[in-house]
Amino acid sequence: MGIVGSPRKEGNTENLVKEALKAAGDAGADIELVRLGSAEIEPCVACDICKATGECAIYDDMREILEKMVKAHGFIIGSPVYFGNVTSQLKMLMDRSRPLRMDFKLKNKVGGAIATGGSRNGGQETTIAAIHEFLLIQDAIVVGDGVPMAHYGGTGVGATAEDEMGLQTSKNLGKRVAELAIKLS
């Protein structure tokens, strides 16, 4: 499952997530793309109803997105860099996923991260670290982009369709997430 945290449809982040999903599909995984920027989602209001009921009190598209995450064996989560971190759209998903963590519904699912920025060292690693932290808190298994790079994940710069390193690290990540998810399922 690819999750695009960008508010822009068909932008640089979506391009790399799609490349990763294509590689995951080539490795044998069933693939699906979710665009948070196109979803009707609200931020967490800290009402704590999820603590009592196990479900979020807000009725919006997040419910369906979280259900898809529970059914998926692996995730590729992408975000553009916004002030060294993830977008508000992706942060809402993280905050609203509390009901999943309560029962560790993402435990042992495989996850990887992609970040795009305006320059090669434009905050991609800190953005990826935020996604990794989310996955670790959910007790998911975090993977990087694998051999030959063996770094944090997909890192894109500018016009990602022309960024060979960004394309390669994202494809490597997609393949790696799929291979491990298939082995574990």
Model-derived features: positions:
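N-terminal beta-loop-helix "entrance" segment that forms/cooperates
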Residues: 36-56, 154-159
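Helix-loop-strand module that forms the ligand-binding subsite of alpha/beta enzymes
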Residues: 53-147
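A structural preference for short, hydrophobic beta-strand core positions in alpha/beta folds
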Residues: 32-35, 144
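Glycine-rich phosphate/pyrophosphate-binding loop and the adjoining helix
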Residues: 5, 26, 64, 137-185
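N-terminal beta1-alpha1 ligand-phosphate binding loop
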Residues: 1-29
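Short, glycine/serine-rich, charged loops/turns that create anion-binding
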Residues: 7-8, 38, 118-119
